[in-house]
Amino acid sequence: MIVSPHREGGQAQFIAQPVPKNTRDARINCLLDYLQQHIAEPHSLDSLARVVAMSRRTLTRHFARATGMSITDWLTAERLRRSQTLLEAGDLPVEQVAEAVGYLSAVTWRQQFKARFGVSPTEWRRTFRRGA
C-alpha cells in the first residue's frame, strides 16, 4: 500500500500524479532511463525512436500503452518533478532550474509549474524552505 506523506498544520500536500518510471516493456524502460539521464536535452520523436530501435509510430503506441501518457506529457511531468527537487534542495536561481530540467524558456516553465502545482516555483521553494 502506498500512503502519501502527511503534513501538519493544513499545509497542502503538493502530491501530483506520479510519473511512471518502470513498465512491463523493457525497451520503454530503457527509454525512460535514457530520458531521466538526459532530461535537460532537447528530444525529438525521431531521435528517441532511434534510441530504442523502433519506428516513430511503434514507439508512440508502445510508450502510451506502457506509461498511460504521451512522450511529451511524460517529459513535461518528469521535468516538473525534477524541478521540484531542485527547488526544494538547492540554491540554483529559478531561471537555472528551468534550464537544468530542459526548458528553453523560464517563462514557459513557470507557467507550466504553476498550472501543475498551483503555486509559482518561488512560492514552492519558500514553502519547503520554511518547513525545513
Language-model-detected regions and their locations in the chain:
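Short hydrophobic/aromatic patch on the recognition helix
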Residues: 59, 63, 108-109, 113
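Short, Lys/Arg-enriched, Trp-marked, Pro/Gly-tolerant hinge/linker segments that flank
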Residues: 1-41, 47-52, 65-70, 77
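Nucleic acid-binding interface residues in structured DNA/RNA-binding domains
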Residues: 120
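Terminal helix-turn-helix DNA-binding modules in bacterial transcription factors
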Residues: 42-47, 54, 64-106, 126-132
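Short amphipathic alpha-helical surface patches that mediate protein-protein
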Residues: 2-3, 114, 129
